[in-house]
A protein has these predicted regions:
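Conserved short strand/loop->alpha-helix "switch" segment adjacent to the catalytic nucleotide/phosphoryl-transfer site
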Residues: 29-48
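Conserved ATPase-coupling elements of RecA-like P-loop NTPase cores
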Residues: 60-62, 87-90, 446, 523
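Residues immediately C-terminal
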Residues: 56-57, 84-85, 518-519
Length: 649
């Protein structure tokens, strides 16, 4: 390899900055230890690991543009205009620093504080892990006027790093194709999933520009499908995006950006007319959906500042009961983003920040920001406190309703809902319950099920839209009370009186089974909204499924076949030839018990969709848009996403 030109600066990003921490031998054997899983999430996580390198360059002030391309063969190309990965000889390893970065787990400048003060990446395994799990990877570096490249197969270099030309560009290009022998579930990248994360990164790192290009799809104008994400105001714009479908209570988004006790803190918040609390927190661009010290600091700063203002203004004088911390957060959408040099992650999924020093930094930032805003906007301040008082009154009503749910749920088996047809199996891990719309479909499901391990809970019509309902109305609703009771779920644990208690969960599979039509989809969405807002842990723990009943039965003589789509139906008709008869199932009740078992309930042949939350922030926005009060955003979403949509004016 020819000797590369070297460039010197105070904190020189060179081979000496690269520290190799661990070998790669276990990555291919135990990929889930490194990227979480080898399903859809793990596949997309590969992209995030590579993009995180570019984001680190941006955080260090050396990168402005990042491009992600989904190629026609579902390989991925990422490109940035950062300094380029160092290519000079690594003294300890005896090969190019680029090869060290690409083939040693944990190798990278992010472990060297002079190169990167903070670094993204939850697993922190870096691009070498992506290399190990790729069938093929090519790295191209533009650095100091020269172009360098190296290719790899399944993590092993095919040849030494070599110079292939000169350039006036700078940056790094990585193209990789995930290994089909590891990612056996799918190799298909979701545009929406990648767009959601890249949009999030653009908001969290204002000023950088992120391009997403999908070469699998060409638009009518001949250009590839794609989007560009860029934000000049960062979290303020992020809040506006998330709350676009909610009615604001304030003129402006309250925002703070600065450093407190050595911790860079960004906060943005706004109140709206909804009854939900929507707090989103990030550490070094990682979505910490389990919360942590930064979120507890935010809550403490918010509660202390608002209560102090309300007391000093005499706005709480007539209140006959105490205000709780929750009351200050009803109808609040907020984002907390901190940058921490050495984050300590805890919790079930390692997404809970444990650094104690961060709490005081965030609390101080929120107190200063909020105090200034309340003094400058007295009308908004009064509106917020009035909202808090209403929330407190509703909380008292909701507590009574919650207690009713609690009492009803912890009763003996005789207290189960009358319409529940239970199963005989006592082991919850082997049991499943089908939530079925209507008594007629419920009757068919009861006849068709395997009584040993399948229970049926019929629901009466469309359940309450919890997105528009006050909390006490939710807990007073009979159908929702029946769901709590049937599932054995209660509210309150030893650690948290308001947390969901799943210790007595009676079924480990909860299956939403609705008609395969528009009404059925609406009912399924209402049920999903309830689970997302009030039983999110069931989704996060992989307990919620959606059944997929067939749309058609195609017959010709003695031959019959079910179809789950129009395309499948047409293919069967073409195969059967003339004389094929088609039956369209508008509802579950149109199938007899044997057909329902064969197509939708039999574990050997059925297809069920596991409900997962890929991006909690985006999921929150979409539920709010689909089920909230604002009609125009919902209409726009349907028109953009529906294959066909008959929307009443």
């Amino acid at each position: 390899m020819s000797e590369p030109k070297e460039e010197f600066n105070k904190h020189n990003y060179s081979a000496d900055s690269i520290q190799a921490l661990e070998g790669m031998e276990h990555v291919r054997m135990r990929p889930s230890m490194y990227i979480g899983d080898v399903g859809v999430r793990g596949l997309h996580h590969l992209v995030y690991e590579v993009v995180d390198n570019s984001i680190d360059e941006a955080l260090a002030g050396h990168c402005n543009n990042i491009t992600v391309i989904i190629n026609e063969d579902n390989s991925i190309t990422t490109e940035d205009d950062g300094r380029g990965i160092p290519v000079d000889l690594h003294k300890k390893e005896g090969v190019s620093a680029l090869e060290v970065v690409m083939t040693k787990i944990g190798a990278g400048g992010k472990f060297d504080k002079d190169s990167y003060k903070v670094s993204g990446g939850l697993h922190g395994v870096g691009v070498s892990c992506v290399n190990a799990l790729s069938d093929h990877l090519k790295a191209t570096v533009y650095r100091n006027g020269e172009i360098w490249e190296q290719e790899y197969e399944r993590g092993k270099a095919l040849y030494p790093v070599k110079k292939v030309g000169d350039t006036d560009k700078r940056g790094t290009i990585v193209t990789f194709k995930p290994d089909a022998s590891i990612f056996t579930q799918t190799l298909e990248y979701s545009y929406d999933t990648l767009a959601s994360r890249l949009r999030e990164l653009a908001y969290l790192n204002k000023g950088i520009t992120v391009h997403l290009i999908d070469k699998r799809h060409v638009k009518e104008d001949g250009e590839f499908e794609g989007e560009t994400f860029h934000s000049e105001e960062g979290l303020k714009e992020f809040i506006t995006y998330l709350d676009a479908t909610r009615e604001p209570l304030m003129k402006d988004v309250i925002a703070f950006e600065g450093e407190k006790n050595g911790v860079p803190v960004e906060v943005a918040m706004v109140y709206n007319t909804s009854y939900a609390e929507n707090l989103h927190s990030y550490v070094n661009n990682i979505n910490t959906h389990e919360g942590g010290t930064h979120l507890s600091g935010f809550r403490r700063g918010l509660t202390h500042t608002l209560k102090k203002y309300a007391d000093e203004s005499g706005l709480l004088d007539k209140l006959k009961f105490d205000i709780a911390g929750d009351d200050f957060r009803e109808g609040l959408t907020a984002i907390v983003s901190v940058k921490v040099q050495e984050p300590q992650f805890e919790g079930q999924t390692k997404t809970k920040l444990g650094n104690r020093e961060v709490s005081a930094s965030v609390s101080q930032a929120v107190s200063e920001m909020l105090t200034d805003y309340l003094e400058e906007h007295p009308d908004d301040a009064k509106t917020i406190i009035q909202k808090v008082i209403l929330a407190a009154q509703a909380r008292h009503a909701a507590q009574k309703a919650r207690d009713m749910v609690q009492r009803k749920t912890v009763m003996s088996i005789g207290g189960l809902p009358g319409k529940l047809s239970d199963c005989s199996e006592q082991d919850p891990t082997k049991c499943e319950v089908f939530l079925v719309e209507g008594d007629s479909a419920g009757g068919t499901a009861k006849q068709g099920r395997d009584r040993a391990f399948q229970a049926i809970l019929p629901l009466r019509g469309k359940i309450l839209n919890v997105e528009k309902a006050m909390t006490h109305k939710v807990f007073e609703n009979e159908e929702i009370k029946n769901i709590f009771t049937a599932l054995g779920v209660t509210i309150g644990t030893e650690e948290d009186s308001k947390a969901l208690n799943l210790s007595k969960l009676r079924y480990h599979k909860v299956v939403i089974m609705c008609d395969a039509d528009i009404d059925g989809s609406h009912i399924a969405t209402l049920i999903l909204t309830f689970f997302f807002r009030y039983m999110k842990e069931l989704i996060e723990n992989g307990h919620i499924y959606i059944a997929t009943p067939p749309l058609y039965l195609v017959k010709r003589g003695a031959k019959k076949r079910y179809a789950w789509s129009d395309q499948e139906r047409d293919a069967i008709i073409a195969e059967f030839g003339d004389g094929a008869k088609i039956q369209r199932y508008k509802g579950l009740g149109e199938m007899n018990a044997e057909q329902l078992w064969d197509t939708t309930m039999n574990p050997e042949f059925r297809t069920m969709r596991l409900v997962q939350i890929d991006n909690g922030t985006e999921a929150d926005r979409i539920f709010s848009m689909l089920m909230g009060d604002e009609v125009p955003p919902r209409r726009e979403f349907i028109e953009k996403n529906a294959v066909y949509a008959n929307i009443d004016a």
